[in-house]
């Protein structure tokens, strides 16, 4: 089979820079695609963390002027990843995370910063480097939404494009006045181009102009065509439904492997699940919880936000505690929720523990030590924490939305009778439904055999990138064949 060359363009990539699940996908998918005769090179911005983490950087192109300054394109590696890094200090070398400054506000020039990434991605697709010609350009989220626009309005032929929505809530909307600085013609500003409610919509541009659109679960692909989850783009997504598909994410099962995980206190596998008890004991101590081996310990690893349903969990905490359960929460986000969980830890000492922030090692320990993992999201394109939970034998308790609905088999009567259940789903996404899920989970936890079956089923579920990579490889080949 002929090897396809794919350029993946994303604003973050694990292990170099990560703020969310996009980085995990961008970092793990290339290796899985290699087994399907797809060679991926990834283009990402030259943030300080990226420049400090790459190996053997070589300048392959220079830009005398790129949105206000000079820039270099570097070819580099990170482990087994082939990379292009856009080294533009005036755009990317600054404190804070990739999108917001230390004050928590978006960088005012984000429109230019990510237009540069998209423009260089399009240029690479059109022969910027004589030795590199990708067959497909794969752009991720609003930060790369202008990439197909740069291709379309250049007047020159280019490769096919795939645009993946990781979260429709983040749309990259900017004022019309930015158009004159983007290097796009006035005719690009139209309903069939980049215009969105009188301004410029980067995400909308990607949805409008890419050859194929994917999102990260079949259920989310269906949900975003409706008004509730469509975030104002449902009409466009309905029009392009024949070019839209949902492909579930996987996780890196080498990084997330309880049998060899150096970040957890005790390693184990499906044959030695009882060893999780040692991780639970360590986790309880870490969060200041009572060392009760028989208490149902819920874990949460999440951004603290309305989308993630963490306000509902805060409201339901008295019922969770009243049922004798414990909570170990790791996350950061909305100040009000951060304060709420810190206050809950003070109010319920020994039963609620909260670490505000993010700690990768602690996230692994939660997966290895919690009995159940709570994901009460109001919407969830795919979700990765529940996939890790399945892998680690932490029974996922999830809202029946998006990728959560697609990846967790609810322990209903039919699934339990046929022995395929892997967790608990609840709907609608309300406090009352969440409280009922606590009761259902408590009853399952009390049944030692039923609970162990849930754990075994979860741990033997294939949550790797193998199947998703096969779907992406077929999508790429089908696209190339359309020429």
Curated annotation (Swiss-Prot):
Pfam families: Glyco_transf_5, Glycos_transf_1. One of its GO terms (molecular function) is alpha-1,4-glucan glucosyltransferase (UDP-glucose donor) activity. Pathway: Glycan biosynthesis; glycogen biosynthesis. It catalyses: [(1->4)-alpha-D-glucosyl](n) + ADP-alpha-D-glucose = [(1->4)-alpha-D-glucosyl](n+1) + ADP + H(+). ADP-alpha-D-glucose binds at residue 18. Keywords: Glycogen biosynthesis, Glycosyltransferase, Transferase. The keyword Glycosyltransferase applies. Coiled coil: none annotated. It comes from the Bacteria. GO terms for biological process: glycogen biosynthetic process. Its EC number is 2.4.1.21. GO terms for cellular component: cytosol. Belongs to the glycosyltransferase 1 family. Bacterial/plant glycogen synthase subfamily. Synthesizes alpha-1,4-glucan chains using ADP-glucose. This is Glycogen synthase. It comes from Rhodopseudomonas palustris (strain TIE-1). The lineage of its organism: Bacteria, Pseudomonadati, Pseudomonadota, Alphaproteobacteria, Hyphomicrobiales.
């Amino acid at each position: 089979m002929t090897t396809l060359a794919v350029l993946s363009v994303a604003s973050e990539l694990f292990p170099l820079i990560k703020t969310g699940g996009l980085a995990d996908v961008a970092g793990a998918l290339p290796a899985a695609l290699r087994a399907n005769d797809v060679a991926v090179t990834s283009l990402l911005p030259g943030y300080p963390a990226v420049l400090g983490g790459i190996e053997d950087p070589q300048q392959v192109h220079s830009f005398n002027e790129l949105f206000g300054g000079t820039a270099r394109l570097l070819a580099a590696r990170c482990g087994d990843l082939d990379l292009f890094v856009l080294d533009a200090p005036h755009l990317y070398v600054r404190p804070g995370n990739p999108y917001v400054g230390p004050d928590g506000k978006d960088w005012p020039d984000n429109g230019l910063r990510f237009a540069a990434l998209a423009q260089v991605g399009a240029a690479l697709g059109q022969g910027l480097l004589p030795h590199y010609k990708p067959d497909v350009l794969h752009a991720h989220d609003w930060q790369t939404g202008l990439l197909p626009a740069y291709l379309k309005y250049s007047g020159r032929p280019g490769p096919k494009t795939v645009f993946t929505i990781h979260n429709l809530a983040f749309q990259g909307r900017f004022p019309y006045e930015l158009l004159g600085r983007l290097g796009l013609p006035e005719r690009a500003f139209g309903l069939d181009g980049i215009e969105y409610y009188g301004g410029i919509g980067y995400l909308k541009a990607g949805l409008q102009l890419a050859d194929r659109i994917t999102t990260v679960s079949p259920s989310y692909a269906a949900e975003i065509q409706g008004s509730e989850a469509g975030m104002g783009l449902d009409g466009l997504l309905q029009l392009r439904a024949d070019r839209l598909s949902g492909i579930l994410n996987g996780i890196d099962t080498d990084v997330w492997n309880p049998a060899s995980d150096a970040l957890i206190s005790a390693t184990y596998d499906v044959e030695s699940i009882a060893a999780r008890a040692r991780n639970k004991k360590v986790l309880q101590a870490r969060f200041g919880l009572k060392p009760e081996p028989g208490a149902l310990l819920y874990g949460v690893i999440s951004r603290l936000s309305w989308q993630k349903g963490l306000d509902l969990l805060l409201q339901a905490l008295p019922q969770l505690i009243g049922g004798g359960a414990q909570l170990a929460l790791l996350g950061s986000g909305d100040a009000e929720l951060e304060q709420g969980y810190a206050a809950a830890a003070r109010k319920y000492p020994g039963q609620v523990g909260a670490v505000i922030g993010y700690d990768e090692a602690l996230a692994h320990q939660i997966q290895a030590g919690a009995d159940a993992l709570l994901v009460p999201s109001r919407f969830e394109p795919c979700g990765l924490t529940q996939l890790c939970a399945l892998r680690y034998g932490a029974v996922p308790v999830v809202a029946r939305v998006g990728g959560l609905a697609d990846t967790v088999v609810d322990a209903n009567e039919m699934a339990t009778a046929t022995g395929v259940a892997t967790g608990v789903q609840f709907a609608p996404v309300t406090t009352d439904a969440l409280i009922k899920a606590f009761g259902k989970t408590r009853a399952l936890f009390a049944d030692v055999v039923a609970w162990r079956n849930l754990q075994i089923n979860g741990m033997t579920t294939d949550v790797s990138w193998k199947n998703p990579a096969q779907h992406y490889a077929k999508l790429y080949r089908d696209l190339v064949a359309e020429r």
